[in-house]
Amino acid sequence: MKAGFLCLVLCAAVAPSAHAQMTWTDKAFVNITGGAQAGSHTVATSATFDLYDEQGTLSSSQKVGSGGLFDLSGGYKVRKNLAAGIGYSWSGSKADASITALVPHPIFTDQPRNVSGSVADLKHTENTIHLFAAWMVPVTDKIDVGISAGPSIFIVSQDLPTALTVTEPGPTVNQITTDKSSKTTVGINIGFDVAYMLNKRWGVGGLARYTWGSVDLKNASDKLTVGGFQIGAGLRLRLQ
């Protein structure tokens, strides 16, 4: 991931100077992209629940991994090769969580028992608004490159285990309750987009972009890193 981010930075630094003499002649662009977001982060939580008139504790750990990506973005020419743009992206994945809990005793007070288990298919989604400035570089009459950077607004939703019920004697885990934790945070984006035009209006292209942010989820022991390295391909529209 670090290598991909470094590549984006180098491309952003080199490409504008290498083609500074070429002016982008279109007025606006629209990009529609499908792909994947890479990355793997761990979210650990600790929550309390009531059972048998006492308080138990529930700890969980799960991986937030790679997922699918949809991106829709557009920009308008401000001056020469510079465009201002806005985009929306969605990324989502599912993962299992392992849990451990201290469960109160049904008869004796202050005699908690250890139980463990797992819960499947906890959803993680990121709806993100990207604001960016893009430097558009015509390479040939059919190929252009866009190098962009700016802030991103992440709207993050994560399923988290919050409580459980047990079967006695044992105890044996009967059901694990989950809750959706939603947070909004601001991060960054830096991207590199290549378009090959089939005619004056329509073409195909590829996107490589790095996004980053972090959120404090309910009951989480540490901040969760969101975003990551994104790659995809799709349709490219140019407006004259």
Regions found by a protein language model. Name each.
Residues 62-87, 121-138, 183:
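Outer-membrane beta-barrel transmembrane strands
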Residues 81-84, 143, 196, 200-204:
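Repeated loop/turn-to-beta-strand initiation elements of outer-membrane beta-barrel proteins
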Residues 140-146, 160:
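Short, structured loop/turn "capping" segments at alpha-beta junctions
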Residues 28-30, 68-72, 127-131, 153, ...:
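Hydrophobic, lipid-facing positions within transmembrane beta-strands of outer-membrane proteins
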Residues 39-65, 89-128, 154-185, 213-230:
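Extracellular/periplasm-exposed beta-strand and loop segments of Gram-negative cell-envelope proteins
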Residues 20-78, 84, 230, 236-240:
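Short glycine/proline- and aromatic-enriched beta-strand/turn motifs that initiate or cap beta-hairpins
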Residues 1-26, 240:
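Cleavable N-terminal export/targeting peptides
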Residues 32-38, 86-90, 147-155, 194, ...:
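Transmembrane beta-barrel strands of outer-membrane/channel proteins
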